[in-house]
Curated annotation (Swiss-Prot):
Catalytic reactions of this protein: 7-phospho-2-dehydro-3-deoxy-D-arabino-heptonate = 3-dehydroquinate + phosphate
Functional description taken from the UniProt entry: Catalyzes the conversion of 3-deoxy-D-arabino-heptulosonate 7-phosphate (DAHP) to dehydroquinate (DHQ).
Annotated binding of Zn(2+), by residue: 184, 247, 264
Protein known as: 3-dehydroquinate synthase
One Gene Ontology cellular component annotation held by this UniProt entry: cytoplasm
């Protein structure tokens, strides 16, 4: 089975990925889990309804397994749900020898990792992602919940024991969710690998390709790209910030939509278009943006804004971005495909780029 090793400064761990990963690692994994006093599974309503039986079959021989089913979507990454999970764990009697399994998409991975990092000052956890989007979030140890004023503002760096990535779960993903996750695959290509971007554009030309073409080699490459960056900079003091390409504007948009109007990948797609546009202005990026957006549209992405989003709201939200320091907004831009840089953007440039994107897309004024 394909295995990728993540070598972070704090921990080295494997990522198992294929269509039957859960079955393939069952014997080895359950032996490891049997060493813990209690297995606590954190999932959401959607995943529990569709896939709980699959995980139950793997965990069947373990004596003590408890589930917590969180609400779907970004609602799960709130103080209220975080506190409720903690209460459940305390009432259940989980001790420091317990282990947590985050079974779901990126939201559950973020929440589960943050719970594991903070319960009794830290217990081990495993990532069992069920979405395309989670190929990015499940690897690298960023765990967090949201604050009403910003996405992922309360968090930590906390690595899992392993990532078990069973791609059979993709079959039940709605097209919109597939698209959202695919956006992070595009991001990895833009910041690191022109050949990967070309392969993505050549292989995936219409929405049904998400289900009929093999995503696994592209996911593996994306995970390898991220693992290499995390090995250099686990806690985002330097190059790891490159993984935030498209996220400064994208997170600002998500916050404006109360973390529900747009899926993460949808907001990041807008953010990448915004960052590419600014890259053309600042660095003269030689990139056929029109061809790129046409390709996105063929895949079903909306590349124009069809709602009114005041610039003042976006700017305020960008100021709350974690990369903002001394009130200076940091953007991840591209000198070329595969050559990201950190750029301190002045308000005037942020506004001019905003006007340019809106003029090329929808009218937001």
């Amino acid at each position: 089975m394909p295995e990728i090793t993540v070598r972070a400064k704090s921990k080295t761990y494997p990522v198992y990925i294929n269509e039957f990963a859960l079955t393939d690692v069952k014997e080895q994994w359950t032996k490891s889990l049997a060493k813990y006093s209690h297995v606590f599974v954190l999932t959401d309503e959607h995943v529990a309804n569709l896939h709980k039986a699959k995980l139950d079959a793997v965990l069947a021989d373990l004596p003590v397994v408890t589930y917590y089913v969180a609400p779907n979507g970004e609602e799960a990454k709130t103080f209220r749900v975080y506190e409720d999970v903690m209460t459940k764990m305390i009432e259940t009697g989980l001790d420091r020898k317990a282990v947590l399994i985050a079974f779901g998409g990126g939201v559950i991975g973020d929440l589960g990792g943050f719970v594991a990092a903070t319960y009794m000052r830290g217990i081990p956890f495993y990532q069992v992602p069920t979405t395309v989007l989670a190929h990015d979030s499940a690897v690298g140890g960023k765990v967090a919940i949201n604050h009403p004023l910003g996405k992922n503002m309360i968090g930590n760096f906390y690595q899992p024991e392993a990532v078990i990535y069973d791609t059979q779960f993709f079959a039940t993903l709605p097209e919109r969710e597939m698209r959202s996750g695919f956006a992070e695959m595009i991001k990895h290509a833009l910041i690191s690998d022109h050949a990967l971007l070309t392969a993505l554009m050549d292989t995936f030309t219409e929405p049904k390709d998400f289900y009929t073409k093999d995503l696994t080699p592209f996911l593996q490459r994306g995970i390898e790209i991220k693992a290499n960056i995390v090995a250099q900079d686990e806690t985002e003091q330097g190059v790891r910030a490159y993984l935030n390409f498209g996220h400064t504007f994208g997170h600002a948009l998500e916050a404006y939509g109360n973390f529900g109007k747009w899926l993460h990948g949808e907001a990041i797609t807008y953010g990448m278009i915004y960052a590419l546009t600014m890259s053309e202005t600042v660095y003269g990026l030689d990139f056929d943006l029109a061809k790129f957006t046409t390709w996105l549209e063929r895949l079903g992405y909306n590349t124009t804004f069809d709602v009114t989003v005041p610039f003042s709201n976006i700017l305020d939200n960008m100021r709350h971005d974690k990369k903002t320091t001394f009130n200076e907004i940091s953007m991840v831009l591209l000198e070329d495909i595969g050559k990201p840089v950190i750029f301190k953007a002045e308000d005037e440039l942020i506004f001019d780029t905003y006007k340019s994107v809106m003029r090329n897309g929808g009218d937001l004024f």
